[in-house]
Amino acid sequence: MESIIDRRIFFKIAATGVAGYFVSPLQTMAQTVTTTPGATIFGTARNCVFVLLAGGPSHMDTLDLRVGSWTPVDFSPTTINSIDWPNGLLPNLGAQLNSNRFSIIRSCQSLALVHALLQNWNQIARNPANATGKIAPNIGSVVALEMEAQRRPGQKLPGFLSLNGGGSLAGSGYFSGKYAPFDVSPSANGISNLNHPDGEAVFTSRYNVLMAGDALLRGTPSPIGTPVDEVSDFYTSARTMMYDPIVTNAFRFSAADQQKYGNSSFGSACVTARNVLQADLGVRYIQITLGGWDNHTNIYAPNNGIYPSARQLDAGLGNLIADLASMPGSQGRTMLDDTLIVAKGEFGRTVGNITGGGGRDHYYIHSTLIGGGGVQGGRALGKTTPDAGYVDDPGWSEQRPVYAEDIAATIYSALGINYTTVRHDDPLGRGFEYIPQNQAWLGTPITELFH
């Protein structure tokens, strides 16, 4: 059973004595790993923000614009850094593109057209239908595990934070629940569970009684087994987060920030991501989900169709990039220099004229926004045919389309993680590969982004 730690469940564990079976019943993570010599490791980023555009945005209306009779006037097409851009639809992101703060990969291709399958695929870097797909952790869980050794005293948040994850969120797979995504629905008031309704003194008294009563079960290893050990870790983690003003403030934001970021759930997630990264409390991977892109009908309907999601994306991500670029990071860099940002859907949408229902259907070709974390911005890698329907020029050394596994390898490499790692601790006994190696042509970092 794979773990996703909803924030209500997370704090409920700490406030009661119920040891639910939230984690996989497996042995302690083994340390035996192997890697392939010669892997390209960039190590240019400390953090990653991954934005899952659930539903599949129309690439030819956003990151790979094609202007035709279908194009609404208010898209206000323009050219930025020789890139055709819908400036009326995405003005804030257009300004960041003009400031060379992100680039676009236009040669991406999916291997299927099923929402749930591909959304999971993009999070676990493999086909979920394959054998290891059933046990595979989210990329964020891998990052959390790999970065755990770098954790400093006082860094109280889990390594993997999910914002607005919803039903599409992939969990920690066979990894310990310690590396599961901590899923939060952001609010300007923060996380209410950080304080107990009966007050700190009453809570502390009850918590101490709980700890004393469960002491015999909290041995290492526990006589009941690994799941209880890991639930015990949840108690401890949740307790350290409570009644800490630094943690509390990391999840709060002002009305002015809420308005600036678009006054939407996605905007709230983006400003929360900014605050959490600035607080430097141990989070190294943040996944934000923005749905609403499945525009089979009425894609250009005023204030409907593509507009709500595009406006949320523009205000939220555009301001997140701008703010990170203005904030001090490590070693004289900015927070944007420290943070790789990736935004993509599971696939694209059909090109050319719209369908009879006024929309666009699922399509293999799509685009990815990628910036910060050492990426050279202001460019478009790869090129599609004039109708945006096929990859004309892949734009990178592999001379083929870019797949989800390549994006994952790029994320790992940017964070200094060896994407060729094989962990020999999986329940299948076959070795868990961060990127599956049975298809040697998949899973290559995109070097051209960093030059």
Model-derived features: where do they sit?
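Ligand-binding pockets and gating/stacking loops
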Residues: 2-451
